[in-house]
Amino acid sequence: MEVNHVELVMSAVDPAQYPTTGYPEIALVGRSNVGKSSLTNVLINRNSYARTSSQPGKTQTLNFYNVEDQLYFVDVPGYGYAKVSKTEREKWGQMIETYLTQRDQLRGVISLVDARHAPTEDDIQMYRWLAYYELPTLIVATKSDKIARGKWNQAVSQIKKSLELPNTDNIVMFSAPKKMGKDAVWNWIEAQAFGGE
């Protein structure tokens, strides 16, 4: 998709605040600091539209980005950040669950994991939860440029084993600085958002 116009239209905490335009939505989930904002910026051809932060736990709302008046990217609060209080984590969890299970416009979820490490327990729980609710999910392994290309197969195998992924499921190796994996992610987004049209 050619992207020239992007707008952050809403930061929501409950369904009453969600946009009402009816465009298909793609949610981005992952633990704090895994690179959701960096992925968003690469996908929309901006350097710093979605704010990247070295401070985990920064996103505390569902941020709806209108892309070309055709779809929304929904940046979901990062999970697994220890310094956030238990009450705060539970509140985020409820907000995220409400959105992911009740939003009719949701067409798919991009679940981000760090290519350099085995998926965390939080990553595994999130993937199982998405699978339980039968939400179409693409696994994107971020920060792939930080590991030698010769070790990619090993990284993919580790992710598939930890998440118990079927062999048919693809994992996109992604690097924000090199914009590597961008086309593969967009192909999946377009198939999910507009495939039935």
UniProtKB/Swiss-Prot annotation:
Mg(2+) binds at S37, T59. Necessary for normal cell division and for the maintenance of normal septation. InterPro entries: G_ENGB_dom, GTP-bd, GTP-bd_ribosome_bio_YsxC, P-loop_NTPase, Small_GTP-bd. One of its GO terms (cellular component) is cytosol. It holds the Pfam family MMR_HSR1. NCBIfam families: GTPase_YsxC, small_GTP. Keywords: Cell cycle, Cell division, GTP-binding, Magnesium, Metal-binding, Nucleotide-binding, Septation. It comes from Levilactobacillus brevis (strain ATCC 367 / BCRC 12310 / CIP 105137 / JCM 1170 / LMG 11437 / NCIMB 947 / NCTC 947) (Lactobacillus brevis). One of its GO terms (biological process) is division septum assembly. One of its GO terms (molecular function) is metal ion binding. Belongs to the TRAFAC class TrmE-Era-EngA-EngB-Septin-like GTPase superfamily. EngB GTPase family. CDD domains: YihA_EngB. It comes from the Bacteria. Residues 22-195 form the EngB-type G domain. Its cofactor is Mg(2+). GTP binds at residues 30-37, 57-61, 75-78, 142-145, 174-176. SUPFAM superfamilies: P-loop containing nucleoside triphosphate hydrolases. This is Probable GTP-binding protein EngB. Coiled coil: none annotated. PROSITE patterns: G_ENGB.
